[in-house]
UniProtKB/Swiss-Prot annotation:
Chief place where the protein resides: cytoplasm
InterPro entries: GCP, GCP_C, GCP_C_sf, GCP_N
Organism listed in the record: Pongo abelii (Sumatran orangutan)
Quaternary data: Component of the gamma-tubulin ring complex (gTuRC) consisting of TUBGCP2, TUBGCP3, TUBGCP4, TUBGCP5 and TUBGCP6 and gamma-tubulin TUBG1 or TUBG2. TUBGCP2, TUBGCP3, TUBGCP4, TUBGCP5 and TUBGCP6 assemble in a 5:5:2:1:1 stoichiometry; each is associated with a gamma-tubulin, thereby arranging 14 gamma-tubulins in a helical manner. Gamma-tubulin at the first position is blocked by TUBGCP3 at the last position, allowing 13 protafilaments to grow into a microtubule.
The protein's name: Gamma-tubulin complex component 2
Gene Ontology biological process terms in this record: brain development; cytoplasmic microtubule organization; meiotic cell cycle; microtubule nucleation; mitotic cell cycle; neuron migration; spindle assembly
Residues modified to Phosphotyrosine: Y83
Name of the gene this protein is made from: TUBGCP2
Purpose of the protein: Component of the gamma-tubulin ring complex (gTuRC) which mediates microtubule nucleation. The gTuRC regulates the minus-end nucleation of alpha-beta tubulin heterodimers that grow into microtubule protafilaments, a critical step in centrosome duplication and spindle formation. Plays a role in neuronal migration.
Protein family membership: Belongs to the TUBGCP family.
Origin organism lineage: Eukaryota, Metazoa, Chordata, Craniata, Vertebrata
Amino acid sequence: MSEFRIHHDVNELLSLLRVHGGDGAEVYIDLLQKNRTPYVTTTVSAHSAKVKIAEFSRTPEDFLKKYDELKSKNTRNLDPLVYLLSKLTEDKETLQYLQQNAKERAELAAAAVGSSTTSVNVPAAASKISMQELEELRKQLGSVATGSTLQQSLELKRKMLRDKQNKKNSDQHLPIFPAWVYERPALIGDFLIGAGISTDTALPIGTLPLASQESAVVEDLLYVLVGVDGRYVTAQPLAGRQSRTFLVDPNLDLSIRELVNRILPVAASYSTVTRFIEEKSSFEYGQVNHALAAAMRTLVKEHLILVSQLEQLHRQGLLSLQKLWFYIQPAMRTMDILASLATSVDKGECLGGSTLSLLHDRSFSYTGDSQAQELCLYLTKAASAPYFEVLEKWIYRGIIHDPYSEFMVEEHELRKERIQEDYNDKYWDQRYTIVQQQIPSFLQKMADKILSTGKYLNVVRECGHDVTCPVAKEIIYTLKERAYVEQIEKAFNYASKVLLDFLMEEKELVAHLRSIKRYFLMDQGDFFVHFMDLAEEELRKPVEDITPPRLEALLELALRMSTANTDPFKDDLKIDLMPHDLITQLLRVLAIETKQEKAMAHADPTELTLSGLEAFSFDYIVKWPLSLIINRKALTRYQMLFRHMFYCKHVERQLCSVWISNKTAKQHSLPSAQWFAGAFTLRQRMLNFVQNIQYYMMFEVMEPTWHILEKNLKSASNIDDVLGYHTGFLDTCLKDCMLTNPELLKVFSKLMSVCVMFTNCMQKFTQSMKLDGELGGQTLEHGTLPGLPAGAEDRARKELARKHLAEHADAAQLVSGFEATINKFDKNFSAHLLDLLARLSIYSTSDCEHGMASVTSRLDFNGFYTERLERLSAERSQKAAPQVPVLRGPPAPAPRVAVTAQ
């Protein structure tokens, strides 16, 4: 069962049980996946489970009747379901909850029905049926009750099957037999009700001597055994799909009549088999049923030969009723088995693989009866031949030719070009899918390998390469499943090697992955230095003001100026401006259900003003068949990692620019230098935090994980392993970079917000102080403005002073509040950082995330923050105020990282 199917089933179950809140569906899904074991059905376990439920049930007869009905239809997974239900009967608490839930649902349904009936007020006269409608209804019921009901039902069933298969294969419609094939009953070979073998009036058999009675009855039986009514033994009309019954002349001698009744089941079985052969020979029932009907027709011919030989003996006067009973014994067993199989296939409405499953299970059930098992093996081998032809084409060439929709693998029309556009990629997962009902029971264990084998070869064929398996060998049905396993294993190994070599060598998968790592995971720093120097001014603009072609040109220039110029795949790198910032995107992916995130999720993207720095990301052009591995899901993960690291790099550059601009502080007086000392310390702490986080992500998460990925790719044996290794690499990077934990993500975003706002504040204050210094220096050094007359000089000085005062009227207030502002930034940053360290410590111990412990040790290398945590903990215990969280600082103004353009 696929992961998406488990998600769907668990959510539907929670909805039916009306479970809200609690641990959520993810907990139960993980529990189910971790405790999933194959159920091995045995006769003893199935019988004991059935008995246990029957004893528990209030109506055991109804339960056993329903079980037998489903069993006769060859229902899949019936025994595992019964076993699960028997286990539920042992859990009293679960039973009590289910009973209460069923009672509440019944009450709600009754209330809904009551409200609907009361809300609709229909006059009493309107509920009466008019005479005309009553007459039409009587005519319809009369037509249903006619003898052609069975024929009409068969015709309706054929039409349904034909429409279903034509819908699946819209380009190739099923052929149709002409109408006269079904309208002429004499062509069927079964009894013609109401038509005798002769127009002569039969003599009353009771008036004949015993020898004459026996001779007449033998002649009648020879007719009846080939589907023709006799004079004294006649077939009764069929009632639905029940077995054929016969009417024997009551005047017949008692001993003879008893022997006749023993022989008549052969004629009844012959009638059942003949009708089955004619019905299943229609195109709508598929090639497997065609082959089964053909094999049965061969056995029926042998039966007719036997009857002809008996007729020859009868004409020679050598066939008595006792001899007929003796000679018919082998045929009785054969026809009984054929009729039983025909009835089971009809009841189960079996097609394709389900027919083969029924035949295979029946062959095993006759293990103690060699002749019956040999007969079933003959039928199964004949019926499986067309199925195995489709299977051989699939596992040896990657081609599906299944005009009757009987094969276990179903093809869906999907375009491979969509694989690099659609986030929910369906090509690899849903282009070819398993149809559980069409898997023969003897191939159940190999179903996944059969699916993968054909998919691998099909991918190579889609690329224009013709593939033919060199170890191809005809597959023939046998009870020894090892024969199938060996052939499928050989085909699977060949297909895996062909596709893997094709992707690795011809399509250079590893080289493409290294190229993506170079850009998305910042493998080479010189390219990003060039690009951010060139594009930073453009990226500070709002998204709607950015010109994408200009960014593309700057990217191209940065690529050509750096060592990335040697990358053969550099032209596949593109610019992508996302509609949401990283935090919003991640919270949507993680499905966080807080009010704020819900509001953000339903907000129009244009309502959230984004800068280019928040929206910027790379994209990568991936062509088929590499898009099977580097699909849209994988690229989205790469983009999340890139945006996370790109923003960290931007914050680092901002802090470094503050460090550069802080050189002007040396020119100020001692009080100003004291004010700046606290800002310098805070800036260094922020820079230390950002740089250590970047070092952790790049050198302690991504590099080791990348080396593991490269090692695994070298040892991969098939494309599914490659997919698993690549997805595991991305998931590990996302997890260890704190992008899958909502709590850590929120705290980290607040820290980034504080850092960005601090840099904006410092740059603004530094510019203001620098302007003040320049104005003062000009006045002191020059005294007068050169090149101007005295009057003009005074006017210019006054105008400049007025403008300066207008722009910096609050300079004194800004200077006086600078120390308080820095203290507030320090308090916020420390509170959020302590919160992050505390959470990291908890996750590293409780969730065994040992990698996060290294972040804690790096950020708190000298115990500075540990001491603060202990001090805050002591203060909290002294104040005894549990309602005030210690590790939380003042709330940030917005949950997402905001950048103020300079």
